[in-house]
């Protein structure tokens, strides 16, 4: 039973796998030297809205001996149950709440800006989730016992990483991979490492799909498009995200 946030839940997943493979180094599963075919049932009680590990098929571990941080996706990673009471997240420090908010947004954005975009409903779900998180996040930070804001963010955390926001497309988790390297080397909180990378990544790739960045900016930030080029709107969208993350401290 995991009681905590994403790191605690992911650790419990690793322990559950390790119980079935006592003769092996658990890291061999994460480096795919061993194919996982079974696990021990585990559940979670969530105390931080962030990674969505309580409903996801992924788990991330850091090897402190090698300085590596790696993710593993497998159906065996999904917990048997998750108890999600927003009141259990009230006491988390604001910095951790902010990092969790960033992770939720990134889990959705890295699916939204995938190469294949073949499902409109998936887009609508992702856009609704992003808009809700951006709306509720400052309330959550400024009102530490606001039940509605905390429940919305907690719900979004699960939806952002159970793959409902990525149905019908492949995922591009390049920002997460860069973030893992930063976290492993500098012991940075996961969400913070992602915000350090995302805007540079976005400015590097936005011309691959300028229209998509424009579309998202209009929906999320009501960007005034009068007499502006698509490129200008796309870059404004990226800047709005930067300013949002900065506002969360």
Please identify what each model-predicted range represents.
Residues 84, 239-242:
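Alpha-helix-centered segments that form part of catalytic cores
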Residues 111, 115-240:
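Active-site segments that bind and position negatively charged phosphate/pyrophosphate groups
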Residues 241-249:
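Short, intrinsically disordered, charge-balanced linker/junction segments flanking boundaries
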């Amino acid at each position: 039973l995991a009681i905590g946030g994403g790191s605690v839940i992911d650790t419990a997943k690793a322990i559950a796998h390790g119980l079935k493979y006592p003769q092996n180094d658990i890291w061999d599963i994460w480096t795919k030297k061993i194919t996982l075919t079974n696990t021990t049932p585990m559940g979670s009680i969530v105390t931080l809205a962030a990674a969505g590990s309580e409903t996801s098929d992924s788990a991330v571990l850091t090897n402190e001996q090698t300085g590596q941080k790696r993710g593993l996706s497998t159906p065996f990673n999904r917990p048997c149950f998750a108890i999600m009471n927003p009141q259990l997240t009230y006491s988390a420090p604001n910095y951790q709440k902010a990092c969790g908010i960033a992770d939720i947004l990134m889990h959705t954005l890295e699916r939204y800006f995938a190469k294949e975009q073949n499902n409109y409903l998936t887009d609508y779900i992702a856009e609704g989730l992003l808009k809700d998180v951006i709306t509720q996040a400052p309330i959550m930070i400024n009102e530490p016992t606001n039940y509605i804001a905390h429940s919305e963010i907690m719900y979004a955390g699960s939806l952002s990483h159970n793959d409902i926001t990525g149905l019908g497309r492949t995922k591009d988790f390049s920002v997460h991979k860069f973030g893992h390297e930063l976290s492993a080397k500098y012991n940075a909180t996961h969400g913070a490492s992602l915000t350090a990378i995302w805007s540079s990544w976005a400015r590097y790739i936005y011309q691959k799909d300028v229209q998509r960045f424009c579309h998202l900016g209009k929906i999320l930030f009501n960007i005034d498009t009068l007499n502006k080029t698509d490129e200008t709107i796309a870059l404004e969208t990226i800047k709005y995200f930067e300013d949002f993350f900065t506002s969360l401290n």
